[in-house]
Amino acid sequence: PMVSCGNALIVSPDAGGVPRARSLAKDLSLDIAIIDKRRDKANESDAMNVIGKVEGKQCIIVDDLVDTGGTLIKGAEALLKEGAEEVRAYITHGVLSNGGMERINSSSMGGLTITDSIPQYDHQKVKVLSVSKLFAEAIRRVHHDESISVLF
């Protein structure tokens, strides 16, 4: 299921992802929130602080990579704790190592959408979108000295 844009909010999972989230939010005319991860003391777990108003919103986390899913899930939990209606993530590369798929499936997240840039399969809460045609067209255009900018 997709989210309703009227009630949606784009979320950057960290400070480094703000430009990506801001660009998407601008394209979709949506607001943005940021998850600020802080470690208070050595050997303590990270604290997730939400910057922005997420109460009653369908939060869309956007990022380039998810590995084990631990940080993503902690971020989603922080958003829900702040009153988010639902949290979904759209991430380009889904490594999902060391039990990441199971971790996502048992989490409080509404779902995760990834591409098949790393081979994965649809699962309970995980949807995989194919980028094979996009990659094939980019390769064809490069081979024929054509612009690839129209693809992105």
Where are these regions (language model features)?
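PRPP-associated nucleotide enzymes
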Residues: 1-152
